[in-house]
């Protein structure tokens, strides 16, 4: 008869960002443990609050399934000695399996006999196997860990309770000096220690102590309560998904409420108010029906509605202190001069091995000028790029950004506009930080995009030049994100700038502040980001073929990958790729100094292929270019069928290899076709 299993680990308050992934990890690790230990089950449900991680297994088998395994040993000629007795090799083999030589039998495998033994292992009761669940808890990994008391071990937070119930039976085991039982803890202020009656009563037992164990239920409660506030007050609340996920992992019993602040603070830029509420206080922003910010906020209390008015007043008081700071900095920063702030950037360190922020900006300005030409910007845009590059980091020295660093760039744009800077310059100051996340928004203006590219390129080259190169998952300076941003911006704007030539030109630049180095590492790093941009939906062989193309133009590479994926599902893909691959492989033997001499042609097929190559212009979309190459497949095959490429006559051989080399030089602008798999 199946049973239900409950495991709850009671801890000190967990960081909010750890709760959800830890809940998921616990469920996955327990499922693996049960499967590996041959304990079948029907379902696994996970639970979490800031002070607990839990999992319930439904329909758990009462006993392991029996195990029968065959083991192959040494060959018979090795297993038996000259007298026909079992050798030490045979005896050692069966001993290692916990058996005797009586279990040996011989089976023929590919014409030769080998020792075989069959081992039968009866399934153990689930109760006995579950004593090993502490291995699951020990194997949990966390971004941070700590020691406590005089213990030598470390964990995400101190462990206070461990509950392990099989139906209503408490299992006895120990974990980190905690002995398991059936006692859990209720809400820190509203509840008490409570007894969990059974695995099935878990949620109800905790609910009686003001703990909602199911994170999904807490989320639904928060959303429903906010919706009720919206209906009652006639407002709209910005239910930000990330903030919602954070808040539900800060509370065990949620109660949402609305507070207010003086409308005078609405004169401060909206971004300052939103940052104060959302990022610093974990409040939800409130708007009117037209979407305008209102002097209100919604917060979620960890508790019931008892004395809620006092809670509201306390939250309002804390927020006002933040808003006072914002109002002060907004007023005082407007007294500053951009030129004075830029001058002070010479004293701000970009990185101790690289130099000052002013030096970084100087290099960025030079790179931006080069990119502006490559991107065919207008004269007005070129001027805007140059001006933006001279000042774009000035807001880092304002009081507002010093207090609210999330507003860097945003406040720069606002202060630049107030100072009379051109709108394109001001916008670029904000946009140069974009994208600020893996799938974040991209710059919308060409000026902002060029500045963003230049800033990211110098950042990448500078850190690589001083040996600060990401390894493994370690990337403290977010260089992968910066490089991914470079790739995304180039693709978004369709700028066909050859990255290899661009990087070469940057390494030719001379700066007093820094000499660029490690170019090969930089190029490989950029290629890896293009590879990631293609995504797992693009087969590995296609990604590799595109990455080995002769033109490192990001939009064209991504388009080529997409075209090849679509083409791979067509009938002519395999024959076309195979003929092109043959041409690519032979062309590697060509002498680069030899040019095609039509007077050496001995058959019509040579002339036909050469003429087709001469007429190959590769115009249009990536799909159209690919089709133009693929239609040459019959011509290529006809050439191979009627021409001995590797002729004994050296002149003929070199000429024919030169024909193929001409073909490859054009086709390789799309992909290295000999890297494609047609099996």
UniProtKB/Swiss-Prot annotation:
Listed EC numbers: 6.1.1.14
Any GO MF annotation of the entry: glycine-tRNA ligase activity
Subunit structure: Tetramer of two alpha and two beta subunits.
Entry keyword set: Aminoacyl-tRNA synthetase, ATP-binding, Cytoplasm, Ligase, Nucleotide-binding, Protein biosynthesis
Subcellular location: Cytoplasm
Lineage of the species this protein comes from: Bacteria, Bacillati, Bacillota, Bacilli, Lactobacillales
Primary gene name: glyS
UniProt catalytic activity: tRNA(Gly) + glycine + ATP = glycyl-tRNA(Gly) + AMP + diphosphate
Principal place of residence: cytoplasm
Family: Belongs to the class-II aminoacyl-tRNA synthetase family.
Broadest EC class assigned to this enzyme: ligase
Listed Pfam families: tRNA_synt_2f
One GO location term (cellular component): cytosol
Highest rank taxon of the organism: Bacteria
Annotated organism of origin: Streptococcus pyogenes serotype M3 (strain ATCC BAA-595 / MGAS315)
GO biological process: glycyl-tRNA aminoacylation
Name listed for the protein in its UniProt record: Glycine--tRNA ligase beta subunit
